[in-house]
Amino acid sequence: MASIRLEMDLRAEPAKAWDAVRDVGAIHTRLAPGFVIDTKLEGDARIVTFANGITAKELIVDLDEAARRLVWSVVGGRMTHHNGSIQIFSEGDGCRLVWIADILPNDLKAPIQAMMQQGMAAMKKKLEAA
């Protein structure tokens, strides 16, 4: 199983960053505009449309307020397994965002990691822009 872990420090209050992450239906406006162009809620899942035209159905697995951690799983599509999480940690005058994805098949690691890096850049721009 391929495992991807990306981390970044943010000049943003942890509560503000977490509020954007936990708003699962507004990724395209509150968390990663430009990287995600639309989000629709469908029961316990969200349909995410990325700027590159890819759409993904993401089942929301857990929203842990105390740990500031969101967990989701992409269902359908080319991946036979996906578990993703974003967690916000207080750090210094700001916070640290940690995004982890475990995926199968392994050969999707490079393209998924490239997309995640684009997502990190979009999140940094949005969350630090207040």
Give residue ranges: language-model regions.
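Glycine-centered tight beta-turn/hairpin loop motif at sheet-sheet or coil-to-beta transitions
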Residues: 1, 51-53, 79
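Hydrophobic ligand-binding cavity/cleft-lining segments
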Residues: 1-40
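Hydrophobic/aromatic beta-strand elements that line small-molecule binding cavities or substrate pockets
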Residues: 8, 56-62, 83-90
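A generic beta-sheet turn/junction motif
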Residues: 10, 51, 90-92
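Hydrophobic pocket/interface hotspot
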Residues: 17-21, 27, 46, 60, ...
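Short, highly charged C-terminal tails/helix-capping segments
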Residues: 34, 125-130
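Short, conserved beta-turn/loop elements at beta-strand boundaries and strand-helix junctions
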Residues: 64-68
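Beta-strand/loop substructures that line and gate deep hydrophobic ligand-binding cavities in soluble
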Residues: 74-126
